Amino acid sequence: MRKKIIWFGVLWLTALSLSRAQTETPTKKKEIQITWLGHAAFELVSSGGTDILIDPFLTKNPGTPAELKDLSHYHPNFILVTHSHGDHLGDAVELAKMSKAKIVSVYMPEPFKKGELPRELIEPANVGDHLTLGDVKVHVVPAMHSSEPSGRPVGFVVEFADGRSVYHEGDTWIFGDMALIQEFYHPNIILMPVGAAADGQSPRMAWIAVTRYFKPQVVIPMHYGALPGSSTEADLRAVFGNDPRVVFMKPGETKKF
């Protein structure tokens, strides 16, 4: 009798386990939409519709297609700025005033005051901060660069609802703490500056960073081809070879991942 009870219990637990396995479904990957707007400017749109502009250097960007220089084209929920150099801050202040989207950045009093940006449109951030913006989380990480006239350079890891993340490096050179960014956030997609010639992160240094510190599924080169003296796509292909993780985008092109 005791053996029958035990076997009945085993069968019941097995049936319960199978029933749960059939009803529980794994988290499905959701679409991440990425548009390269030229240089370091990107638009990310989550599956929930959160629209984020990063480093929106547009109207004076020679790499931005003419039809995308019109700021009325954009309706961001948030604007992320990695530092105050003109080719990254770009049109952020004007876009914030037009769209009422908050600028998320290390506080930069000079450009913000000059643009007469209302305080409620500024979301000060610092290295180590974790911000919930719509249905995404944004982690603020270090960058190795300068930030005249004020502030400090940072990068952003944008984490989506399905757990995947996009790392916009900003403008940086390779640095050892990239290992911590990989350890903490495991970026799946890296938007990597590769266009420096005399200074900054060259294609070779960028590739060393990818192979030494990161394990991405996708690497999208940026910060090249627009400004005088920057690397060309041919320069990049000579270094990156035929690595299938590298996705070359054209300014204005949109891809879904």
Predicted regions and their residues:
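Pre-active-site segment of Zn-dependent metallo-hydrolases
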Residues: 37, 46-85, 90-94, 146-148, ...
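Active-site-proximal loop/helix segments of hydrolase catalytic cores
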Residues: 144-213
